[in-house]
């Protein structure tokens, strides 16, 4: 079926940097709280029953230490598809336009922090580094925003490479397959979604990587995501699960 057209996007948030300081401060000092578990409890039946979400190799996500989970991005539901199979509480970068009353309360207490869209937002990286320095987990999309076409982007943004090199954190590439059609829910079309967690990647820490280094690492991470995605496309959920089990 054809994809429902996404709403027109605003690619630059006009609100000043200072508007978002309190959201960053909360994530840096307190992080996700009881709201994370409430959202998880409410959404888990929807993910498992309506979207038949299942995972492959979620144990590739380390149970401790700083971790960056790096998925592709098709849907507003991708946060939840990725996090529901991970036992740790994860923190998410999300576009700043989402931070409006009253929903921003759920975001800030649920582990979400803003990236000021259309700006070189260093505050978002400071927040991410703060979470990682405490041994936390960050979800960061390689492509930046959601794909409007339903296909993987031609190339990743270099931000994932920047964070990987500066932090030295473990990277877990993730392929989310099927979520491009989640936007068709208004037509009562509910796709089957598969989330495959790849083998962990690690890079030597580089305090101040140049743009070329950032892009090179981003390309490597995204290359692994594309490999996982292509496997799901060719072999399906069951086929890839069998391949992973056979390789262990």
Report the location of each language-model feature:
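A transmembrane-helix-recognition feature enriched in membrane-embedded lipid enzymes
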Residues: 7-63, 88, 101-110
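Conserved beta-strand termini and adjacent loop/short-helix elements that scaffold enzyme active sites
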Residues: 56-58, 95, 115-117, 198, ...
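Conserved beta-strand scaffold positions in the cores of enzyme catalytic domains, especially
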Residues: 55, 92, 112-114, 171, ...
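Residue-level "edge-of-site" marker
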Residues: 59, 120, 177
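Catalytic core of membrane glycerolipid acyltransferases/transacylases, capturing the structured
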Residues: 48, 63-120, 127
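Non-catalytic C-terminal accessory region of glycerolipid acyltransferases
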Residues: 1-35, 123-248
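Short amphipathic alpha-helical segments and helix-helix/interface helices
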Residues: 43, 82, 104, 128, ...
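A generic local structural motif
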Residues: 53-58, 77-79, 99, 125-127, ...
